[in-house]
Amino acid sequence: MSISGAVDEAGTPLLAVTVDYRNKPAVKSSSGGWRSAGFIIGVEVAERFAYYGISSNLITYLTGPLGQSTAAAAANVNAWSGTASLLPLLGAFVADSFLGRFRTILAASALYIVGLGVLTLSAMIPSDCKVSNLLSSCSPRFQVITFFSALYLVALAQGGHKPCVQAFGADQFDEKEPEECKAKSSFFNWWYFGMCFGTLTTLWVLNYIQDNLSWALGFGIPCIAMVVALVVLLLGTCTYRFSIRREDQSPFVRIGNVYVAAVKNWSVSALDVAAAEERLGLVSCSSSQQFSFLNKALVAKNGSCSIDELEEAKSVLRLAPIWLTCLVYAVVFAQSPTFFTKQGATMERSITPGYKISPATLQSFISLSIVIFIPIYDRVLIPIARSFTHKPGGITMLQRIGTGIFLSFLAMVVAALVEMKRLKTAADYGLVDSPDATVPMSVWWLVPQYVLFGITDVFAMVGLQEFFYDQVPNELRSVGLALYLSIFGIGNFLSSFMISIIEKATSQSGQASWFANNLNQAHLDYFYWLLACLSFIGLASYLYVAKSYVSKRLDTS
């Protein structure tokens, strides 16, 4: 962030709280901005190529070479995805408290390469088993242990990589400079654009290799991609801005002290609190009066906290209602790599007489719609909205997220209607008892729900990224992005829990469950209608919470 009047010998403005790779004050003209962000977005493209090379087709590997049932495989995918989305909390803690973002990215990249290498070796172990109805695999025990150990090592590596790379990229822009502040908002759009470009390449190339050539090769290529990501990251070292961490207390300790002090001072009178507020110069506003019970931490009786520390603690606490009301959106988001993929496997997938599209490749329509829509959103819709609202982002971050949640509700309605059509077609052609038969219904029927998912992500996903980066204290921005990712971690676990409960409840008395291995006897349409109802309730809850949200005070010093 810039300091007025701070210049080098050539008259180039310097930046405070940031240094260059030589540990000297960063010079604005030769560091940061898009020159640095380009390298970091390149790293994200390669990393997402590697990650989705594993996750996008994971359910096919589990139900194929490892021989798990559909319900068991979906539960395992959700459990792993949930873990991968929660581990960024650990990675962000390590980065913001100890290593810093850049060093954490380096360590996570090395761990990533090791995990993907072991995963490749596990796929080379021969396996010959039929589909199991148990939650365990029928593959050789050593293969299963090696595979899942490597899989969760990849999740751990992703936990250190994901929040730090994005926060490190956003750190390259000075939010107090109007032009760089505007560029930072665009950075989140183009970051997601790059991420989806990497995902799109994975879905068209790697999924075909995994389904038709070799799983070992399909897992080995992501390992090579992570080596490339590490090289690209190092190439940009000379251009990066590195944030300087304060040498006093950890931000976690400072925030924790506020909560502890407020509890210790719980019995102090309102007059004492008012006196402390006046003594410290706390301005009465909506921000200061929200969570006013924390203002008791300002009373010197049992340990006083500063106003800045109080605001840090409040800014974290304000995120909780938004976080909670977005969980249903995360449950909906978890369905595309699981049941959507299994649906596609039952449908007519021929493009040419000799080529069938991989079911997992259908997920590419999510990325494709994002790649197409983000430039339209960033270059057309936002300037139009900006001319009316005079806001740098055109619309607020909360409005953007709410629009995405509404679109996720529409996506589940469309998914339910399409599945009803697929089941009717299977019944009309007498294929209800033929799980291996191809339902004479084009797989392109699934495209609208995938496209809606993509447009939903442009609004909700990118909005959540920017919101959780922007609304936390500066020193906790890796944690802010980890909190955003944890929404999807908990969402995946909730999805897995729902699947397990519904599987047990609907398979009693020998009846086919909603998630039967034979999808022509299953009722995924019921599950999608349930998610649509939950999405509507989640949207209503979100709108109620967002209406009363108080934004973080901007430090103008």
Swiss-Prot record:
Membrane topology per record: Multi-pass membrane protein
Gene Ontology annotations for the cellular component aspect, listed alphabetically: membrane
InterPro entries: MFS_trans_sf (IPR036259), NRT1/PTR (IPR044739), POT_fam (IPR000109), PTR2_symporter_CS (IPR018456)
GO molecular function term, any single one: tripeptide transmembrane transporter activity
Tissue expression: Expressed in shoots, roots and stems. Detected in leaves, flowers and siliques.
Species name: Arabidopsis thaliana (Mouse-ear cress)
Name assigned to this protein: Protein NRT1/ PTR FAMILY 5.10
Annotated transmembrane regions: 49-67, 79-99, 105-125, 144-164, 186-206, 215-235, 320-340, 365-385, 401-421, 443-463, 479-499, 526-546
Domain of life from the UniProt record: Eukaryota
